[in-house]
Regions:
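Two-component/phosphorelay signaling modules centered on CheY-like receiver
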Residues: 16-35
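Short amphipathic alpha-helix used as the core "switch/output" element in two-component signaling
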Residues: 45, 67-85
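Active-site residues of response regulator receiver
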Residues: 58
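Alpha4 helix (beta4-alpha4-beta5 surface) of REC/receiver domains from two-component response regulators
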Residues: 68, 84-86, 96-112, 121, ...
Length: 141
């Protein structure tokens, strides 16, 4: 799979409307396939059954936050036979989460934060930073 391959992205966010907007923006402007889940438990199952190039998780979700979900996926990947490579993570954060989320940037695999509310162009830039080989298919106005 060269850099021209379609990148696969998993979004987990309990804000369904925002998740749909993110998916639409990614698939409109970048060459990628996007799976989504408003439910961290189902997102975990998707991550175990499919292979992704990038994870985009909401930091603040009920039951399991984005950081914990990433940690659990990492543990499962490390214990898989053969061990799997954990894709990079972009965390989407809301107000009040910034301080803890900033600390998570020091963790291996956490590639960036996008604070809500955000401009779609900012998110697209972050995705391109995480996936340097991703191809653009359109240009946002």
């Amino acid at each position: 799979m060269g850099s021209g391959s379609i990148k696969k992205i998993l979004i987990v966010d309990d804000d369904v409307a925002l998740m749909r907007v993110i998916r639409e923006a990614l698939t409109s402007f970048l060459r990628c396939e996007v799976d989504t889940s408003p439910n961290p438990e189902y997102g975990f199952e998707l991550a175990l059954t499919k292979t992704y190039d990038l994870l985009i998780f909401d930091f603040s979700m009920p039951m399991i936050d984005g950081a914990m979900l990433f940690f659990l996926i990492g543990k499962a990947y490390n214990h898989a036979e053969p061990p799997r490579i954990v894709p990079p993570l972009l965390l989407v954060t809301g107000r009040g989460d910034e301080k803890r989320a900033q600390e998570l940037l020091k963790e291996a695999g956490v590639r960036g934060l996008v604070a809500k509310p955000f401009v779609i162009n900012r998110l697209l830039e972050k995705v391109k930073e995480c996936l340097p080989g991703i191809e653009s298919v359109g240009s946002p106005k």
